[in-house]
Each structure stands twice: as C-alpha cells, then as structure tokens.
Amino acid sequence: MKDIIYIKDLRVKTIIGIFDWERKVKQEVSIDMEFPFDCKRAAKTDSIEDTVDYKTICKGVIKFVEESSFQLQESLAEGIASLVKDTYGVESIKLRVSKP
C-alpha cells in the first residue's frame, strides 16, 4: 500500500495567460501536488535518502515555473508534472495549478 505525499499552496510568480495585459507582469500561481509513495522504509530508517525530498522537489518546481512562460495553465501543469516524474522519480502525480 502506498501513502500519499501532499505539497499544498506552493506560490510562484510567472508569466502566464493569453491576453497581452497578463503577459506584461508576472502573476502568482498556486500549485498543489500529491503523489503516491511507500513511506515504510523512510519511517524505519528515519533517513532523508529513503524518502522523497520535498524541499528539493519544491525548489525544482519553483525554478521551472519562475523561468517559464506559458499561455495556458494546462501547459504549465503538464510541464510541472513531467519535471516531477522525470527528475524526481515520482511515478504519478495529481496536480492543481490556479491563479488566485
């Protein structure tokens, strides 16, 4: 059985939107992520090497989002999902990107 890791309300500024006025200044987006992970080994060893390093994932997502420029939130979400799966070995991810 897998546990669920949650990262909620990660706020990052980026260029996003289809209208000219949206693309003139960075807007804040809020990102929620959840992904399955078996935490048994990490719980036994109490070692960061045996778990998902949330800080590293958050730093990577922040860097990606800050450096990106998308018209659609869907494109940004797909980019984040690909980054997290490909770079950090997460097998699947549930993601929400919103402009508060």
Describe these PLM feature segments.
Residues 1-100:
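N-terminal, polar/charged subdomain of small-to-medium soluble alpha/beta proteins
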